[in-house]
């Protein structure tokens, strides 16, 4: 790429393993692997590394090719469709408490007309395609992606914002010496969308969260 006047200086992303986020027994080993990856990137001249600390599910979309009137398409997030996925496909216990009554009414109406193909498309879009692209926990061809996804969610039972913040602080404290050695800036991707989903805590949603990250080390 340098022969074409370009320079490779940014990596997006270097994914953080789930066990690091929920504080699993193997997190120290995984953090060491992460530090080695950072060092290797640093030796290649990389100065900016993007990452995120979103539990289980990365950026969320309900449609990867939403059509618009001018003939273009884009990624799209429809909260009603996502709520339907949460309530009637995942069947997450207590999920109804996370949505206002008007939205629940829309979900009920949607349930009367949604086709099996549309349900499968939601599973493919929210679980398989997005997550397979981001971190490979779930991939095309997996027999029961919903079951796998539920198991991933189960690791976060009892993990609240405070616990997730502490796990993020632990991770950043461990990797910063490597970043300083190679002059690497860590660039955190904000939670997308910036609010709690699927009962999971989100800790990079606004300026208060960003201030906490900058002051936590």
Which residues does each predicted region cover?
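Acidic/histidine-rich catalytic cores of soluble enzymes
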Residues: 100-217
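Acidic, His- and aromatic-enriched active-site or binding-groove loops in soluble protein domains
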Residues: 34-36, 67-99, 204-216
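Acidic (Asp/Glu)-rich catalytic clusters
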Residues: 1-9, 39-45, 176-183, 213-217
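Active-site-proximal loop/turn and secondary-structure-junction residues that shape catalytic pockets
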Residues: 14-15, 53-57, 190-196
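Glycine-rich anion/phosphate-binding loops
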Residues: 22-40, 163-171
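Hydrophobic, ordered structural segments
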Residues: 46-47, 54
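Conserved, mostly hydrophobic/aromatic
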Residues: 41, 49, 186-189
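Surface-exposed, active-site-proximal loop segments in enzymatic domains
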Residues: 14-32, 57-71, 149-159
């Amino acid at each position: 790429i340098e022969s074409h006047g370009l320079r490779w200086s940014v990596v997006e992303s270097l994914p953080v393993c789930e066990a690091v986020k929920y504080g699993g027994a193997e997190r120290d080993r995984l953090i060491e692997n992460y530090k080695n990856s950072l060092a290797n990137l640093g030796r290649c001249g990389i100065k900016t590394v993007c990452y995120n600390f979103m539990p289980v599910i990365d950026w969320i979309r309900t449609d990867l090719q939403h059509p618009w009137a001018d003939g273009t398409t884009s990624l799209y997030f429809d909260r009603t469709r996502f709520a339907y996925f949460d309530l009637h496909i995942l069947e997450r216990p207590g999920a109804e408490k996370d949505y206002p009554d008007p939205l629940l009414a829309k979900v009920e109406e949607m349930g009367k007309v949604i086709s099996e193909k549309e349900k499968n498309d939601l599973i493919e879009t929210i679980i398989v395609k997005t997550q397979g692209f981001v971190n490979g926990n779930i991939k095309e061809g997996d027999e029961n992606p919903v079951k796998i996804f539920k198991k991933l969610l189960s690791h976060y039972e009892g993990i609240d914002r405070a616990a997730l913040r502490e796990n993020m602080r632990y991770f950043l404290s461990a990797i910063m010496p490597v970043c300083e050695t190679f002059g690497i800036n860590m660039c955190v991707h904000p939670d997308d969308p910036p609010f709690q989903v699927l009962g999971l805590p989100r800790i990079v949603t606004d300026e208060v969260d960003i201030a906490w990250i900058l002051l936590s080390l």
